[in-house]
Amino acid sequence: TGISATNKLKFTLLGDPALKLPIPQLNIVITDIFNLNTNEQIDTLNALSTVKVKGAVLSEHGYVMNSFNGLLKSKVYDKPIKLQTLNNDFEDLEPFNFDLQQSILYAGNVSVEEGLFEFEFVVPQDISYVDGSGKFSFYAYNDEQDAIGAHVDIIISGFDEDAEVDNI
């Protein structure tokens, strides 16, 4: 058709690449994760377990920001899956393999009061049962400040034998 594959890769940057990105200075950390079915602290999320997550907004020096009151947006992701590009140009290039963490197990908003937050959720049954680690992703803000954080050391695997039976 006369269209070269190299012309498809041209693009224009909008904005000033010399500007520094406004990355929040405050950090968000998880302090405790509990399985409410067993009332135990856990390091693994099982399907159908009811989980309570507690955390804090910390200053640059690691202290709880008692003056921070705002909203926390949180997402919990299942393990990454392996994907491959399609090589639609049919060139001599090999398809590219990459990992993508796209399956969201929980997304919600909760209030942060005096730098502390907590929320509960039920881990869905349709998790990936392959061994691996999931991810918590956090963003909190108020009128004056914002904070970011992530926790990637949470194992998501198995089924909670203590989960309540759903008879509906």
Where are these regions (language model features)?
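Surface-exposed coil/turn segments at beta-strand junctions on protein surfaces, enriched
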Residues: 46, 65, 101, 112-114, ...
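Beta-strand-rich interaction surfaces with strong enrichment in secreted/lumenal proteins
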Residues: 94-97, 105-112, 125
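Surface-exposed loop/turn motifs at beta-strand-loop junctions within extracellular Ig-like
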Residues: 59, 78, 125, 140-144
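Caspase-like cysteine protease fold
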Residues: 1-62, 148-160
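Exposed aromatic-hydrophobic patches
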Residues: 118-124
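Short, compositionally biased serine/threonine- and acidic-rich segments at solvent-exposed termini, linkers
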Residues: 137-168
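Short flexible loop/turn segments that cap and initiate beta-strands
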Residues: 58-93
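Short glycine/proline/serine/threonine-rich loop/turn segments at secondary-structure transition edges
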Residues: 125-135
